[in-house]
Structure formats: structure tokens, C-alpha cells
From Swiss-Prot:
It is found in: Cell membrane. This is Uncharacterized Na(+)/H(+) exchanger Rv2287. Signal peptide: none annotated. NCBIfam families: a_cpa1. It is a multi-pass membrane protein. The chain crosses the membrane at residues 12-32, 57-77, 94-114, 123-143, 168-188, 191-211, 216-236, 243-263, 277-297, 313-333, 358-378, 391-411. The lineage of its organism: Bacteria, Bacillati, Actinomycetota, Actinomycetes, Mycobacteriales. Pfam families: Na_H_Exchanger (PF00999). It comes from Mycobacterium tuberculosis (strain ATCC 25618 / H37Rv).
Amino acid sequence: MNGRRTIGEDGLVFGLVVIVALVAAVVVGTVLGHRYRVGPPVLLILSGSLLGLIPRFGDVQIDGEVVLLLFLPAILYWESMNTSFREIRWNLRVIVMFSIGLVIATAVAVSWTARALGMESHAAAVLGAVLSPTDAAAVAGLAKRLPRRALTVLRGESLINDGTALVLFAVTVAVAEGAAGIGPAALVGRFVVSYLGGIMAGLLVGGLVTLLRRRIDAPLEEGALSLLTPFAAFLLAQSLKCSGVVAVLVSALVLTYVGPTVIRARSRLQAHAFWDIATFLINGSLWVFVGVQIPGAIDHIAGEDGGLPRATVLALAVTGVVIATRIAWVQATTVLGHTVDRVLKKPTRHVGFRQRCVTSWAGFRGAVSLAAALAVPMTTNSGAPFPDRNLIIFVVSVVILVTVLVQGTSLPTVVRWARMPEDVAHANELQLARTRSAQAALDALPTVADELGVAPDLVKHLEKEYEERAVLVMADGADSATSDLAERNDLVRRVRLGVLQHQRQAVTTLRNQNLIDDIVLRELQAAMDLEEVQLLDPADAE
């Protein structure tokens, strides 16, 4: 692999050093990003670039196929699980125009630009496919403060467009390796088959997992099923030559929809904790690896024809085309959508110019593009070196760096300039859900208490507790009685938190005196942990 080491070739010790360095960089970069209000991907790329300057770290290379087959399903699954199925359905037209139309338009524009600036034609086509999708992790990390509809469109686009881009990538790489070209009609047919097959695979896996989880009430086994789900969906679709990305998305949306009725609370808490940590480390590590590749990409380009100046001009030109294509597409499709709505006499959703600017500016590229670039084969079918492979990796690295550093850091300023209306829908829906939940508790209490044979005095105590919660949820916060009740409950909450700390100290002291075992300590600690989490984030104190 051009003299470069993979992680395992220098032995387990060096591999462990790499893992420790990666995790440390992810943790430090994320903490600093939150503290100084800088998008964590920005600092992670910079920290990766510094690691890449260290000789042995600079030689480490992650296989692009590993990212596409191991990391991508996990990332897409968790992002899909945190995306609103209803919002995707309501904004499906816009998401499809972005995740298919914009991907193809970007691929064509980048390919033409690269070819015009001297890149080999097949390599230019591959570069266009690699840079065509936005990145789900980048959007989630850098655009999370956007209003719900704008964020849903960006998230939905970034989840689905990987499928479109990977089809383009497979076709362009195959042609570059020596396969016969493919016409527009055949390409459209491949897209249709890929998406329909991916949808069917996702529905099948999602349905099977739902049936299994209805019959299993064990957090560990359900957690294992949760881990297997994205990979099963991805592999099934890939084996059918269909979109694994779409299969993962569909399986996740199926489980998102049926989850509240088939997944138990303990299993949900455990699975969410696992996926939070796993995707945090995967996403962060991939951003660090983006940075690690930059010094090596510069070294490789410096020794080729035209050297670094030519490659830099090409990379900056391609970056400009990527950004400009997105801006033009957002403006054009908005006008087109309004025209179609008027023709069909449908209500038109008004999207102001400033809001369109925010959407246009949020087209970050990320680790998926880098993984695709690294997955470009070293040679063609004839044994000749793959044309401009190092140049592809360099250009992709620069585009990722510029979009994340420039667009990512300036996006908050653009959002403030846009003066986007406050998203009150989420708060209204949250209030509606809490009100209905509180009323349901009051209505159900007599029936449940009667079924369990609860004593009348205990029922009255529970009724008072639920009524107080309902008052806080339903009443106007400006009401003096409600305000007094809220203040009293907050004081009770703080007292309970303080008492919990003394309980912990007492139990820990017993363990330190060898009067109880560590297992007993952990059992009590688990119960106190749950109580503390509830007290730290109470529903009626938000």
C-alpha cells in the first residue's frame, strides 16, 4: 500500500497507542469545542492534522472499505433513529430533490470542472461521485441549532444521499477500471433497483427485528439485536446489489415507529447509552482520521506533475463548485417547487431567501467522502495505476477541510443573520404530550389501584402526587399558586439530591469497612443512579 502501514502491521502495542491517541483526541477536541463554542469536527480535524505530522502516526491509514462496511451502517442507523419519521414524510419531496437531484448535479459539475483543469476524465468522474454527498455526522454536529424543518431536510438529505453517491461511485470506478460505459437509461434503472431493493431489505429486516423484540424481554439480548440490525440490513441489501444505505435508513425508521410499543424501558436505556458512546467515538475518530490524511496527501502530491500548486488550485476550484452548485440548486428547486404547487393548486410552504441561504451554506462534506476516496483501488483491471488516485485523495481532503472549517465555523453567524423564526412547534407538541400524559395518569389511577387492591389512604396519596404534577404541566406558569408549587417541588428535588449524596457516602463507607461486598454496593448504586438522573432532569422542572 505504497509503503504505508495499516494499524496492525507494527504490532499490538502501536495499535493500542493509536487507539488511545484517537480516543484522547476525540474527547479533548469535543470538550474544547463545546467550551469555546466551536464545532467539534473543526478541532478534531486540526488535532488529526497534528497527529499526522508525527512520522509513525502519519503512516497509519484506515481502509476506506472498512469505513463503508463497518462504520457507515452504525453511523447511519443511529442518525436515522434520531430523525423524525413524520418530518421526513412531510418534507419528502425536498429531501428527494436534494438527495438524488443535487447529488447528480454536484457530481456532474465537479467532474466537468476537474476535467477542464487537467484531471484525467475517469478520475474526474470518480471525484465527482466521491464529493457529491453531504455528511450525516457533519450535519448532526454542526447544524443542530437549526429549526426543526430545516434540520430535518438536512439530516434526511445527508442520510439518503449516501445511497445515491455510492451507486455513482461504483459505476464510475468500474468504468475507470476498464468496464464498459453505462448510458443514462441504464443508470436510472440502476438507481431505481438500488433504492427499491434497499427499501424492501430495510422493511424485511425491520419487520423481523420487530417480531423478535416483541418476544424478548432481556436488555442484553435486545441490545445485541440492536447492534446487529444495521449490519444485517446493510449486508442483505448489498448482497442483492441494492442500496445498503437505504436499507439501514428504512430499518431504523421502522424501529423508530414501532419502538414505543415493542421495546422495553430497560432495553431502550441500555441500547441508547451504547449507541451514544459508540457513534460518538466512531464519528470523532473519523474526523481525526480526516486530519491525519492531510499531511500525507500533501507529501504525495508534492512529488507529482504540477506538484502542490496545481493540486491546490484544482482543490479550491472544486470546493467553489461544490458550494456554488448547492447554492444554485437550493434557489432553483425552491422556485420550481412553488411553481409545481401553484399548478397543482396545493398550499405552498414559504421558505424565505435568508432561510434558503442557511440551507445552502450547510452542505458539509465529511468522512464518507474520504472513505470513498480511500476505497478507490490502487490499480485498474489491466494492472496500470489508477489514474490520479493521490490527487483524488488530496482534493477530497481539501474540500472536507474547507467546508468544515469555513462553512462549519461561519454557519452560526449565517443563522443569526437569517433571523430564522423561533421553532415553537416542538415546544407546543411537548406541552400537548405532557398534558395528555398527565391526564391519562389521573384517569388510569383509580382503575389500576382497584385492580391491585391498593389501600384507600395510599390511593389518596398517589392522587395528590399526580394532581400536583398535572397542575404544573397544565397550568399557566405566571399563576402565583402554580409558581409556589413549582418552587416547592424544586426545593424538594434539591433536598432529595442532597440526601442521595449522603446515602452514597454511607453505602461507600460500609464497602470501605468491608461490611458489604462490591456487588451489593453496585446494586444499590444502580438504583440511586436512576433516581439521580430523574432528579437532575425532571419533566416538570424544564
